[in-house]
């Protein structure tokens, strides 16, 4: 198993940060909507303004065409109605002319001696199998037999039966669909009822568990209070015993022999020792004064050392400030030179663009654009 050390974790975090920054830079370069690097914002603004002007112009032209089309449709409807009225009037005039001036008795084939001769003649065909009904006579075509009406009636009856059958099948399908929906609804209701029962059971179980936990917590609190009371009572008894022992012991009675030790005269029992004599106190005071002088000397040396380091840090900070100001001055000069160079390049690109726009050129293909912006840098 590999063990991750802090150095590896720091290196991995640095690489992840670099990858994230590269992805952000690629999004700023390759994303057409959010790209802010490598683009001409002024040209984009001009394109957007031209596109809006084009859209407004096209919208006005479409509205003009639509108004003209509505006008033409209205004119066509008026002319169509006028033509229909003209045809009706012409047909009515023809019928009136035929009824007035083209009567049957004025025709050339009308026989004065037998006015009903045409009515007495045999029809063009007596039946569908008439011998006179030849092909050249053109008296019978497909669907023009004498049983056409009967066949038409049978077809209508058959269509009606089919329609009734389809309607019955549709009603049965609707009934089956309603039955399926009813069964589905009943199943959902059963599932909902079961879910509600389970939910009620869960709530009841949860309440029982909460009540049991609450009762257990109450018992724990009572037991804890009892233990605390017993501990406090035992502590009070111990304190009373200790106070009694101290009151009747050698410490408060100031017995000088109580501090004597079995290890020699220079050893004492600290819990019974009442203090030192004058010689011991003077020796301790002398040692303490020497320690004070030594500590003052060390503090003075440390202060002098700190002053030297402060002076060095001040000089170094002053030098760093001067160097930083020099660096900022150089950066401003470089930035000013870069701005001038960018301005001249922008002017050259603008002139080249105007020349390219003025000169005829072929439409670039997708292969031409795919060779640019293949990397983030």
UniProtKB/Swiss-Prot annotation:
Annotated compartments: Cytoplasm, Cytoskeleton, Cilium axoneme; Cytoplasm, Cytoskeleton, Flagellum axoneme
GO cellular component, one term: axonemal microtubule
Top-level taxon: Eukaryota
Annotated spans, Disordered: 355-377
Gene Ontology BP terms: flagellated sperm motility
Coiled-coil ranges from the UniProt annotation: 188-238
Complexes and interactors: Microtubule inner protein component of sperm flagellar doublet microtubules.
PANTHER family in alphabetical order: RIB43A-LIKE WITH COILED-COILS PROTEIN 2, RIB43A-RELATED
Protein name: RIB43A-like with coiled-coils protein 2
Source organism of the structure: Rattus norvegicus
Record gene name: Ribc2
């Amino acid at each position: 198993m590999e063990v991750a050390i802090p150095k590896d974790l720091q290196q991995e975090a640095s690489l992840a940060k670099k990858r994230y920054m590269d992805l952000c830079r690629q999004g700023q370069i390759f994303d057409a909507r959010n790209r802010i690097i490598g683009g001409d914002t002024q040209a984009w603004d001009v394109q957007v303004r031209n596109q809006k002007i084009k859209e407004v112009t096209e919208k006005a032209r479409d509205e003009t065409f639509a108004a003209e089309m509505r006008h033409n449709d209205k004119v066509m409807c008026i002319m169509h109605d006028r033509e229909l009225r003209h045809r009706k009037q012409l047909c009515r005039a023809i019928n009136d002319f035929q009824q007035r001036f083209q009567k049957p008795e004025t025709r050339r084939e009308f026989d004065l001696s037998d006015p009903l001769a045409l009515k007495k003649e045999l029809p063009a065909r007596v039946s569908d199998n008439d011998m006179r009904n030849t092909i050249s006579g053109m008296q019978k075509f497909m669907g023009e037999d004498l049983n056409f009406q009967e066949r038409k009636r049978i077809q209508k009856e058959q269509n009606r039966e089919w329609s009734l059958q389809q309607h019955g099948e549709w009603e049965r399908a609707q009934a089956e669909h309603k039955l399926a929906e009813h069964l589905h609804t009943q199943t959902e209701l059963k599932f909902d009822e079961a879910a509600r029962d389970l939910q009620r059971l869960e709530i009841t179980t949860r309440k029982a568990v909460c009540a049991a936990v609450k009762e257990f917590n109450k018992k724990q609190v009572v037991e804890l209070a009892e233990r605390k009371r017993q501990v406090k009572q035992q502590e009070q008894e111990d304190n009373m015993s200790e106070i009694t022992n101290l009151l009747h012991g050698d410490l408060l009675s100031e017995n000088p022999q109580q501090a004597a030790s079995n290890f020699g005269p220079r050893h004492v029992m600290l819990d019974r020792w009442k203090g030192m004599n004058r010689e011991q106190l003077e020796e301790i005071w002398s040692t303490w004064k020497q320690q004070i002088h030594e500590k003052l000397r060390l503090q003075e040396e440390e202060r002098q050392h700190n002053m030297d380091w402060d002076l060095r840090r001040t000089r170094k900070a002053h030098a760093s400030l001067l160097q930083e100001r020099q660096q900022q001055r150089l950066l401003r000069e470089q930035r000013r030179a870069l701005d001038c160079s960018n301005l001249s390049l922008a002017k050259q690109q603008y002139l080249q663009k105007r020349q390219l726009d003025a000169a005829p050129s072929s439409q670039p293909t997708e292969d031409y654009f795919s060779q640019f912006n293949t990397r983030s840098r």
